[in-house]
């Protein structure tokens, strides 16, 4: 599985599970880029085979509805959807 890393300032451990064709996912990535924070992301729809099952199980742990984007912050907080204010608040920005 190909987890991509985006360098930036440390605002905690940020993992973004997204779909490559999702507009809300693109908006969330753009927000993180504009905020200049470091984060990792994975396009779940591009993962194949058994790895895809593992990723889906991981996302469902945080978001049983399996909707995107799903952002996990510091392995403790989950934000689902493009929620600009919630993201800024969670990252203390």
For each feature predicted by the language model, list its residue ranges.
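Loop/helix-junction capping segments adjacent to catalytic residues or to phosphate/diphosphate-binding pockets
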Residues: 22-25, 49, 80-81
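Short glycine/proline-enriched coil/turn segments at helix->beta-strand junctions
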Residues: 36-38, 64, 75-76, 93
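Short, structured active-site "lid" loops
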Residues: 57-79
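Thioredoxin-like thiol-disulfide oxidoreductase module
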Residues: 44-65, 93
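Generic recognition of short, well-ordered alpha-helical segments
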Residues: 26-30, 53-54, 82
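Non-catalytic, surface beta->alpha helical segment in thiol-disulfide oxidoreductase systems
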Residues: 73-93
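A generic local structural motif
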Residues: 1-4, 56-58
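Local sequence-structure signature of Cys/Sec-based thiol-disulfide redox active-site neighborhoods
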Residues: 2-40
């Amino acid at each position: 599985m190909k987890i991509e890393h985006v360098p930036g300032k440390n605002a905690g451990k940020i993992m973004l599970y997204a779909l490559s064709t999702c507009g809300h996912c693109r908006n969330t990535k753009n927000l993180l880029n504009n905020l200049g924070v470091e984060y990792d992301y994975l396009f779940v729809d591009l993962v194949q085979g058994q790895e895809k099952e593992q990723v889906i199980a991981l996302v469902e742990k945080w978001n049983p509805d399996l909707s995107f984007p799903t952002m996990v912050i510091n392995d403790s907080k989950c934000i689902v959807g493009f929620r600009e204010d919630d993201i800024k608040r969670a990252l203390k920005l």
